[in-house]
Swiss-Prot record:
Positions contributing to ATP binding: 88, 90-91, 111, 123-124, 174, 181, 260
Enzyme nomenclature, EC number: 2.7.7.-, 2.7.7.108
InterPro entries in the record: SelO (IPR003846)
UniProt keyword ATP-binding, yes or no: yes
Protein name: Protein nucleotidyltransferase YdiU
Cofactor: Mg(2+); Mn(2+)
Amino acid sequence: MSVWEGVNFTHRFSELPSAFFTYVTPQLLDNTRWVVWNGEFAQQFGLPAAENEELLNVFAGQKEFAPFAPLAMKYAGHQFGVYNPDLGDGRGLLLAEMQHQDGTWFDIHLKGAGLTPYSRMGDGRAVLRSTIREYLCSEAMAGLGIPTTRALGMMDSDTPVYREKTEYGALLIRVAETHIRFGHFEHFFYTNQLAEQKLLADKVIEWHFPECSEAEKPYAAMFESIVEKTAEMIAYWQAYGFAHGVMNTDNMSILGQTFDYGPFGFLDDYDPNYICNHSDYQGRYAFEQQPRIALWNLSALAHSLSPLVQREDLEAALGKFEVRLSQKFSELMRAKLGLHTKVDEDGRLFEAMFELLNQNKADYTRFFRELSNLDVKSPQAVIDLFIDREAASAWVDLYLARCELEVDECGERVSAQTRCEKMRRTNPKYILRNYLAQIAIDKAEEGDFSEVNRLAELLKRPYDEQPEFDDYTKLPPEWGKKMEISCSS
């Protein structure tokens, strides 16, 4: 039986005019081999759970496959606030679309496939370390429940790639509901290709926002949906302590899904000024700046949509960003604290918590996980996370008093056990700390991929106890704290 039997393919983007893309044949790597195949996810598309040579040959571009029509998308974007017209898929190719078991179509994108017309000064390759980081983080985010692109698998090779040192080329099979970015609309706006921009908007509505087609102003409704989805994504980032690192408009998905994992980082010590990108000298994309930058990016998108949407409608939609962000962030933080009843004083409780975390530089993830264990542990386990134990004790007393006000639908007081069981499904025990990723990369570069596979499995269930992996909850060693990652990939 064919491995493709029962898998449905299409390629709607390839039906658009030539202004949208260029067809490109993947440039083969030497001795390509599987590093990891995401079998559990693959089965959701009708693909086999285990990797094999047929899958390798087709996805690596070594064998022609009728449903695939590899193409490089053209787009533009604002990078660190400066418009760059010369962007596009410089090392990745959109192969086709594949239908999920729930009926949703997902793009299949091969990253590291070689030169394209948009490679600029690059070589079109992706190195092993950056490919491992993107694979692990996209799957870690999915495990956490944060909107994200996914990864179907990754491969390494014997092809040398020259960066600061000689490395080896790798391939990532990225899967996403769309690869359309803010920068697609910007490209057509700034090149005055307004008919193409209108066509793009029509297709985005048809493919991704069909409900907007019934609206009085479909394009305005589309933009409002993009604003809302972006606000929700940012709320997740801030609640879970994720720093993206390179929030250029060409890295912003129209569906509010975390896109293009480069110099990302999860908070270790709580530091709102955390900068994970080694190249971000001004801190433009620092952790606490992410909501502001998302709104800036949406404003740039709004400007590019001005031929399609009236100014007052664009401004009205932008005005809803902070409202939706605040609503979603509050909802997520309440869940993390086990507080489902709204009380006016909660804002002060939240503020005091963040101030305490910041002043003591306590570990963000461990703090919330310990709060989730107060049904089986003493409050001292939380207090001991802080240098200023007196202040921590005072806050914990306030928090526990607040928990006493929680009641269920029947008006009954919520027990600590019930509260904490829910919190443990919201506050992860495991996250992809940068030092863990680096250890896996170091081993992989020596030919040992066991740690990559171990992390990939562990991070699928970040909320579960998995006691055999307790070592992965350790705080980072000195060398692994607040790691700044290079954009070099």
